[in-house]
């Protein structure tokens, strides 16, 4: 029987909870409702709790109150994305409730979960039911209702997990979009993984780290690991080569071991996956053509890809140098008022700088900066005042959390997109007070409509729109309004929703994957269909999104 939890046992719970979430992060990511490339709930929650776990492992204590403070601090500073911030707030309240204790009883254990829920709900401006908040609330209520019957902390935790699981299964009944897509809430699932790990820790059991599953669809990560490679010329095999071969009836019989042996002669980093009808191959080689010719001995080539890794390495070096320069600029720049913008893409960063941004933090949809990232920039600027432009709804809560931590008087302008950030920054007045700037910059968001074009990462149906993986989607604000296999048609569908007879200016920001011919086609179409609209086009260089649009 475990009637008390001390610091050591709580540390074991945290470590197992973090490990269980880490093992299931991909599963949690897969529950994301929208088919938009995303920072992803599982990834953000995993990074958040890993920060808390590392802080705990470096500052172990028998005193649960002291350990709780350490855990809470790690979560707070490492919080990424809205799901990560909510997770940090749940355990901020939990740990606040035990901060004076050396060990806690079953009753205090239950009360701490309830305290966490109350703290998290207060931190969210407009709580939505059917999310991680609901799962946490229902689980905590069940624990409080059961505490008098619980044999010990293990029994209470098991009961809490049962209630959390039931609540998670009910989330589609509370949130229509979950029911439409046929999934449970991703944040709630992530929290359940943490709770299940807690129970393992309480029982003295260990969850082993699981190797990440190989994605046979994308096959390999396009981001090659160049660590340790100093000179581009040191790369022996310069072409990352992939192929899929469908076996032919009248072709050479496939012997996997022979195939592997022969393929290994072409280079290194060989991966071969055989699923009876198709063989998938990844190899680094100097002669991609020879690889393809060899593959044709066995059947038809149905998918080919070649990437020049030497060119990629040159690009990595360039970006690292640019990043170092930006880091040094951020660290060395001291200002009276810091204007901190979260931005992705070299062109967008330069645009923000030209408009008066003093500090740029690299981040966006698939790379949410942590609370600590934002805090560090503000503190290193030694400013008296700060304005944060999150430019993404999933970075909003981390920005607000950072604003509450720093000593400088800091406000957050609720910009949910890059176009909104640009419109807000246009209204910044060096001579105005912080409150006046906050009001004027926030008011500017009412005058701009934002849109974007990106690709779908999964098949789904949202708001009656059938979406297929790899189609181009048009988003007006956060709502998917069109999806088409043809990029230009997707853009037309989106702009037809954004533009009207009152529209005056269209700002178009092209991403790194934007096609110049399509960009020109878009401009010509706008000039023809909306002759009174002035078009301003910028090279943003952002990944994931081929285009950002702002209509005023």
From Swiss-Prot:
Regions crossing the membrane: none
One Pfam family of this chain: FakA-like_M
SMART domains reported in the protein's UniProt record: Dak1_2, Dak2
GO molecular function, one term: glycerone kinase activity
Gene Ontology process terms (BP): glycerol metabolic process
Matches recorded under NCBIfam families: FakA_VfrB, YloV
Residue ranges constituting the DhaL domain according to the UniProt record: 8-200
Protein name, entry field: Uncharacterized protein SE_0901
Top-level taxon in the UniProt lineage: Bacteria
InterPro entries for this protein: DegV_domain_contain, DhaL_dom, DhaL_dom_sf, FakA-like_C, FakA-like_M, YloV-like
Listed SUPFAM superfamilies: DhaL-like (SSF101473)
PROSITE patterns: DHAL
């Amino acid at each position: 029987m475990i009637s008390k939890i001390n610091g050591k046992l709580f540390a074991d719970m945290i470590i197992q909870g973090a490990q269980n979430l880490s093992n299931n992060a991909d599963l949690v990511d897969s529950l994301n409702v929208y088919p938009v490339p995303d920072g992803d709930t599982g990834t953000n929650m995993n990074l958040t709790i890993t920060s808390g776990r590392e802080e705990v492992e470096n500052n172990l204590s028998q005193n649960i109150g002291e350990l709780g403070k350490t855990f809470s601090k790690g979560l707070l500073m490492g919080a990424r994305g809205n799901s990560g911030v909510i997770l940090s707030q749940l355990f901020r309240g939990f740990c606040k409730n035990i901060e004076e204790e050396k060990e806690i009883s079953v009753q205090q254990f239950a009360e701490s979960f309830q305290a966490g829920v109350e703290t998290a709900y207060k931190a969210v401006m407009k709580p939505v039911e059917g999310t991680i908040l609901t799962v946490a609330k229902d689980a905590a209520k069940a624990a409080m209702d059961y505490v008098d019957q619980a044999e010990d902390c293990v029994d209470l935790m098991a009961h809490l997990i049962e209630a959390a699981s039931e609540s998670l299964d009910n989330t589609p009944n509370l949130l229509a979009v979950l029911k439409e897509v046929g999934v449970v809430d991703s944040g709630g699932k992530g929290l359940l993984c943490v709770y299940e790990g807690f129970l393992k820790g309480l029982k003295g059991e260990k969850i082993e780290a699981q190797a990440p599953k190989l994605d046979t669809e994308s096959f390999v990560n396009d981001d090659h690991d160049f660590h340790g490679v100093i000179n581009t010329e040191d790369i022996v095999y310069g072409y990352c080569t992939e192929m899929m071969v469908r076996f032919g009836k009248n072709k050479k019989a496939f012997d996997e071991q022979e195939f592997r042996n022969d393929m290994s002669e072409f280079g290194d980093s060989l991966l071969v996956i055989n699923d009876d009808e198709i063989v998938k191959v990844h190899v680094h080689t100097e002669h991609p053509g020879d690889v393809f010719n060899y593959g044709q001995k066995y059947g038809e080539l149905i998918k080919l890809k070649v990437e020049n890794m030497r060119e990629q390495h040159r690009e990595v070096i360039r970006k690292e140098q640019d990043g170092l320069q930006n880091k040094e600029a951020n660290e060395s720049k001291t200002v009276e008022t810091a204007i901190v913008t979260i931005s992705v893409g070299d062109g967008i960063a330069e645009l923000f700088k030209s408009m008066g941004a003093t500090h740029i933090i690299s981040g966006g949809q698939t790379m949410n900066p942590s609370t600590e990232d934002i805090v560090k920039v503000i503190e290193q600027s030694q400013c008296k005042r700060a304005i944060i432009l999150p430019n993404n709804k999933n970075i909003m809560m981390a920005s607000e959390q950072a604003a509450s931590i720093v000593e400088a008087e800091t406000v957050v302008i609720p910009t949910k997109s890059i176009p909104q950030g640009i419109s807000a920054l246009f209204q910044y007045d060096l001579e105005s007070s912080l409150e006046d700037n906050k009001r004027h910059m926030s008011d500017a968001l009412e005058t701009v409509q934002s849109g974007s074009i990106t690709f779908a990462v999964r098949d789904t149906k949202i708001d009656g729109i059938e979406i297929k993986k790899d189609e181009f989607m048009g988003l007006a604000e956060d709502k998917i309004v069109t999806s088409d296999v043809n990029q230009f048609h997707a853009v037309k569908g989106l702009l037809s929703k954004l533009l009207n007879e009152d529209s005056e200016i269209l700002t178009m920001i092209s991403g790194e994957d934007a096609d110049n011919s399509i960009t020109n086609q878009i401009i010509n179409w706008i000039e023809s269909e909306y002759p009174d609209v002035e078009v301003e086009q910028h090279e943003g260089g952002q990944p994931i999104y081929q285009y950002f649009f702002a209509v005023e």
